[in-house]
């Protein structure tokens, strides 16, 4: 595609398979909503074997494809027909085509970093993504209906990108077709990933041959999709010292040459692309494209990490939480449907050893009886949701010094007892889904704070912000703080004017923590137009009881409120 004002030049290459000498009449017609926009035709004398033929089309007043949340996704159909000299049909193919311009710019204030800021059709796009895993271990078991539901849920969570992780496999045509239609950008990794043995990309000649064959087959199939944003050499690939691999690596250089030859899109050497592989506050200025952590850092430490982060792109991180009770009842026998941990219960360990949240949940909410499994799940999932929401909003408050967040992970390919997923194997959403959905709203009020668990009588420092990916907003923000019993402790209403695709930070404020099970701060954003409903963000802070823990009934009530 090449743009000139409001028109576009589309060029393509047809690959023809001839079985014998014959004259073929070829045509290509671009159609939009049933009406032909432009066409091309030619005749060619086929010979046995493979031939290629270039064609080009001029599209006046082209309609641009936009990522989700930033406009419509108009799709054209390219009809390619081959007929013999007697006008009998030899072959016919129909391709879906979308037109958009893509540029990659440096993140604000970044130096010596790869360009991670995505600009589509002249507008900077903050990446709000999730890491997508195959919903089944075998691709043959994945139906289009399953993908429609899964990707529809991702779109409803206000996501505009999926990262197809290098430890998975390249998806079916259905996957990319649905992303085209929904406006979900695709970060496509080649099929390489870190392992427990070695993260250095293989240089074995036979492996490199297979890698090249796979890439040569995949790139021409994927490159026609407007949703395809970029390629990556793979997941968490490094050199021998543990530094993220770059294009000097023989393996990665091979893939780069193939992308440059077969497509014109951006390619990252790997993800994380460094120079740090993992987010590290001790090495500021080196957290460009980073991964991790995948755990809730603690009732204070988690907030310190994300308040001080200087990541340019946070392409993989998460927080773990227990599976839904309905899922556990399908995979565990009755004797294992009890509160336990993965040190003591090998069945639980087999279904999620790395994601044991027992110690974390008990340290925040106190002890649980064996029969308190439902409450335990709700408290575990609440911390997962809270931790994710804070990380996403903290990164987004720094847009475009930070250019995107990609949650690990959206779904799971098999059922587990605990994990970092937002939707379980059976298609039921965890609490974290709803918190991510709110954090990714195009326009949403947000709150900066220092910790989750407080002593009564302490003073907490807070700062509200308005995060805006959309058009200019004019209205007011109402800040209210209430005790768990409903007593109004603080109220302030401010007129706000938020520029298009920019954030607005408001004046900090302080509140004395009440002698109550919890403090709730409501941020209510109201437009000057009475037509739009208010946008509300709710933040709950726990207070320590006599034993130093939070009252778990507060978390249980919040879980039940969101999951209704």
Residue ranges of predicted features:
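Secreted/periplasmic carbohydrate-active enzymes, especially glycoside hydrolases
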Residues: 1-163, 397-398, 402, 428, ...
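Active-site-adjacent substrate/metal-binding segments within catalytic domains
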Residues: 63, 88-195, 204-230, 346, ...
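Alpha-helical structural signal in soluble globular domains
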Residues: 81, 174, 178-184, 221, ...
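Flexible loop/turn segments at secondary-structure boundaries
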Residues: 105, 134-137, 169-172, 195-196, ...
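Generic beta-strand/beta-sheet core signal
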Residues: 121, 128, 165, 187-189, ...
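Short, charged, surface-exposed secondary-structure boundary motifs
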Residues: 195-200, 436
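Active-site neighborhood of glycoside hydrolase catalytic domains
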Residues: 202-278, 427
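Substrate-binding clefts and catalytic carboxylate motifs of secreted carbohydrate-active enzymes
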Residues: 231, 268, 275-278, 295-474, ...
